[in-house]
Amino acid sequence: PGLWDYHTHFTQWAYTLGRLDLIDARSADEALDMLRAHLAERHAAGTLDPDQYVVGMRFRHSLWADDAQPTLAAIDAVTGDQPVALSSADMHCGWVNSAAARKLGVHVGESGLVGELEWFDAYCKLDKGPGAADELMRLLRNAELDAASKGVVGVRDYEMAENIDTWIDRFSQGLDGLRVQAGVYPERLQQAIDDGWHTGDELPGSHGLGHVGAMKMISDGSLNTRSAYCSTPYSGIAPETFGTLSYTPEQIESYMRLATEHGFDIACHAIGDEANTIVLDCAERTGAHGSIEHAQMLKERDIPRLARLGLAASIQPQHAMDDRDVITRFWGNPAGIPYAFSALRKAGTKLLMGSDAPVAPLDPWMAISAAVFGTESSDREPFQPEQCLDFATALASSTAIGRTTLKAGDAADLVLLDADPSTVRTPESMRSMPKHVVGTMLAGRWTYQRR
């Protein structure tokens, strides 16, 4: 069967394919060297507009040494009056210069960092300007083709935007290379209800490819920004911090109740163990159905609750690979189990796998590899091997039908391969499966054929 990515920010992933990527920077200085070269290249090409933001993606300052962290002075020295905004890999904070801070209307201190809800609001302002819509459509088409080349037939899109109207417009323009479930954020939920939408409704003009998704809510922050809400303090951080909630428990419950009473599933981001407990408590009180997004650290007593409440765990196995060293650094004494994939499965929880692109690349084979082998390289020991999944479970969690084979009557969403992934024995080989994709079919139509 064709593959699904159950957690994407599809517009931001498309932009990533055409923006400065800072994922390999090992310090603030290295990131700024990459930025300096990028600015020089664009200046030489005549594509640098002083009225438009220069945007970079995916820096990981949680892995940088304490004396190699972002500062406002350092980024200002490199960028001058050119507005520059850099997004962290987890998209939960940004590093901006003074020119961008003024233009965005955000306050920055000595670090130059903007976090959580303030950053989410600011980030949405970065993609405005002449020609932006045409350029975005070009990038979106490239992103759909890139996904199809990996065997992907569908995504859940949790872009922070007017997602329903956006995808209706995109389908009307012929952007039809994927099935899309378009999520709705809490601040737009009432409008969606007033417009008569419910989870599962078909988007007009999509020819059955587009549907309204769940109400996506972010309950807490992230591990890399030390803002995931935990019941025990982060290791080595002064002053002591437990992370933060994006909404109060009362607000979380209120939004869940509103969604549930009006035909919307919920997709609630929860990373820290205490955030997961709060979200599960709210779901239990409201009868909400849908998924917990990430479920990165769970108290042992909470693991069986997802299955009991009928909630899926929407997991991103590549995050475990990216975070394994950060976990050791900041979750030294956790009250819960991080990345409890196997424990959730054994408890009867439905698993849905995704990337959270652009946090990790939109590539289900990468997610499957991380889930099965627990490491990116045969040269490194698996991370928590007891939580690894078998291949059949990982593959089934990456399809729309929840199984590894097609039957007569199934939708003709499929991927053809010239190698059998079930026989793969190394993470490197599983991660190279995209080169074995011969073709991808969506609703009986080829969206990718290898030449």
Task: State each model region's role.
Residues 176-216, 291-296, 300, 326-352:
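Phosphate/diphosphate-binding loops
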Residues 1-197, 217, 224-271, 275, ...:
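Divalent metal-binding segments
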Residues 7, 31, 97, 151, ...:
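Divalent metal-coordination and catalytic microenvironments
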Residues 243-285, 398, 402-421:
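Long hydrophobic segments that form regular secondary structure
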Residues 226, 264-273, 315-317, 344-367, ...:
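Short acidic/histidine-rich active-site segments
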Residues 363, 373-451:
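C-terminal cap of metal-dependent C-N hydrolases
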Residues 14, 98, 164, 168, ...:
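Histidine/acidic-residue-rich catalytic or RNA/ligand-binding cores of hydrolases
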Residues 283-289, 305-314, 347-350, 372-373:
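Glycine-enriched alpha-helix->loop->beta-strand junction motifs that scaffold or abut catalytic
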